[in-house]
Amino acid sequence: MENMLVAIDNEYPGRNYKVEIFTEELTALCPFSGNPDYYKIRIVYVPDKKVVELKSLKYYFVGFRNERTTHEALLNKIFEDLKNVISPKYLKIELFVNIRGGIEVTVSREEGETLEKVD
């Protein structure tokens, strides 16, 4: 599915700025029950030479709709794919799992230079 993501040139590659993306339109299937899992996802990155084209990101998310996957695997798949496509200076992804059975779960991963200068 990585090939669904489109990278476009960063028009300001010499500048440190952050891009923050948030959506509630991410679903996948529980690998055990087959029931849908609903997610909110927050992506924060400091671009280098490329940025992600947002329509391609939306279609990429839709591609998970019928995939059986754990929360942890989903987070790491999205993280690796985005990292491979745009090679950001910094990347953080938080995956908020819709509450099920009274349990609230958030999984996250981050790599790269800190955002201290751009916060």
Model-found features: residue ranges?
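N-terminal intrinsically disordered, cationic/polar leader segments
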Residues: 1-119
